Design a protein with these regions (language model features):
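Transmembrane helical cores of multi-pass ion-transport proteins
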Residues: 1-464
Length: 464
């Protein structure tokens, strides 16, 4: 009775019917100078995380995937998503939890002496099927049961994963004390410069346009600047840096063929791949819908409406396509998507937004084109990548009410500021109620982190 009661394809039909009449205007409305300006700085805002994730991906998968694959996957997936999805203001890209799942899958394949890429392809294809079926069954409607409680724990987990990967990479540099401290200082300087430049729009220096330019171009400029400084002879005399491992010419890692030989995986493991795929599908379902819901928030003043089911179906198809050619999976990226909405806002109050497919398509086309200068990325020190991860972790923490309550619960009751929402909760609800609620969230986060640390459960950790 449960399956028969599902109105199959209803949500997809409604999304397509609502979005099809607007499709031409989605492209036409973006043919402006504002879109060109937005593409130029959104490229740099998206490019820095792509390079960071590419470097981490290479280290965590034994070189099976690297910067080349992340660039190509992000570029192609982003262009396809901009052209096909219902909400073009959402950007797709590499995410921390997807990286964690991929790393856990690689470790499990190594432990079981299984070929990684064939297993990866089967898991991705099963996930693709599950996401498409979920979109056909109108499952995105379930996201209304996802509350701020879940979102805060989810974002805290994402932030901690960024910080963990950064510190893990830096720890490997401490085989020599001087090299380790040089790497640690470089990462801290990179993180501080990224944070400072990204927040420059809130300063009082220079003109509004100049502040916006510094803020938007800042993180990518920091990577270039710190890399250039690391190549100076005076700095190199202080110690050597581990740098990104890049091929001399563009190509897939290890010189492999484009399509993964999926038949190289034993037959019974092809069916077993559906088990981890369930957890990856849950992760993508939550990440995708939470991000798109954030983009469609009434505070962003979007007028053309949401299309959750069509967005999920598009992501499912992209996941399947990336899997069969062994490219990293992409998912909706919250920070980049919100930057896109802000970049296309009109006026200082942002009461109107140009909703277009041009910018998303253009940004990811530029990311794909950057693969032509791939060898130059081999100069980037790995501590710079760690610094970008530290910055991203700090950025995800910002505005997280759970993490803010972890601090305010210790404040002196006589010194609480009722004008601050988190501190006002302490006054209205009482310290005990706030502390118990925060403790439950902390226990959930700790349980998830314990799953990550246990090799036997690392595969299911990102989606639990």
């Amino acid at each position: 009775r449960g399956l028969r009661s599902i109105q199959w394809l209803r949500g997809l039909r409604e999304d397509v019917g609502r979005k099809a009449p607007l499709y031409f205007s989605d492209w036409r409305d973006g043919l402006t100078r504002k879109s060109l300006a937005a593409i130029s700085f959104l490229f740099f805002a998206c490019f820095a995380p792509v390079i960071a994730f590419g470097g981490a991906m290479g280290a965590l998968t034994g070189g099976a995937m690297g910067v080349s694959e992340v660039l190509v996957s992000c570029g192609l997936s982003g262009m396809a998503y901009a052209a096909l999805a219902g909400q073009p203001m959402t950007f797709v890209g590499p995410t921390g939890l997807t990286l964690a799942f991929t790393a856990a899958l690689y470790q499990w394949c190594t432990f079981m002496s299984l070929p990684f890429l064939p297993m990866y392809a089967w898991v991705g294809c099963w996930t693709s099927l599950m996401l498409v079926v979920a979109s056909m069954a109108n499952a995105s409607g379930l996201i209304r049961y996802c509350t701020r409680f879940t979102e805060d724990v989810f974002n805290a987990l994402l932030a901690f994963n960024f910080l963990s990967e950064a510190l893990r990479s830096l720890a490997t540099e401490f085989v020599d004390a001087s090299r380790g401290f040089l790497a640690f200082d470089t990462a801290l300087i990179t993180a501080w410069l990224c944070q400072t430049t990204a927040a420059f729009r809130n300063k009082r220096y220079l003109s509004a346009g100049a502040r916006e330019a510094v803020s938007d171009f800042g993180p990518a400029a920091v990577i270039v600047g710190v890399t250039a400084v690391s190549l100076l002879p005076a700095v190199q005399r202080l110690g050597d840096f581990a740098r990104l491992s890049m091929p001399s010419t563009f190509g897939l890692s290890g010189g492999r063929e484009l399509f993964v030989n999926m038949l190289a995986l034993p037959a019974h493991f092809r069916w077993f791949a559906a088990f981890p795929a369930v957890f990856l599908a849950v992760l993508f379902f939550l990440d995708q819908n939470i991000t798109v819901r954030t983009v469609n928030s009434p505070s962003n003043n979007l007028k053309k409406g949401a299309a959750y089911h069509l967005d999920l179906a598009t992501l499912g198809l992209l996941t399947g396509g990336a899997s069969v050619v062994g490219l990293p999976w992409m998912c909706s990226a919250t920070v980049q998507s919100l930057n896109h909405v802000r970049a296309m806002s009109l006026g200082s109050d942002g009461t109107e937004v140009v909703e277009t497919r041009v910018t998303g398509f253009g940004v990811h086309a530029a990311i794909l084109a950057s693969a032509l200068i791939l060898p130059s990325f081999s100069a980037v020190p790995l501590p710079v990548i760690s610094g970008v991860f530290l910055y991203l972790g700090q950025k995800v923490m910002k505005g997280n009410q759970f993490l803010q309550r972890c601090k305010t619960v210790w404040l002196d009751e006589d010194r609480l500021n009722i004008d601050c929402q988190d501190e006002r909760q302490m006054v209205v609800l009482g310290r005990g109620a706030v502390a118990r609620f925060t403790a439950i969230q902390a226990l959930c986060l700790a349980a998830l982190w314990a799953l990550k640390l246990n090799p036997a459960t690392a595969l299911i950790f990102p989606s639990v």
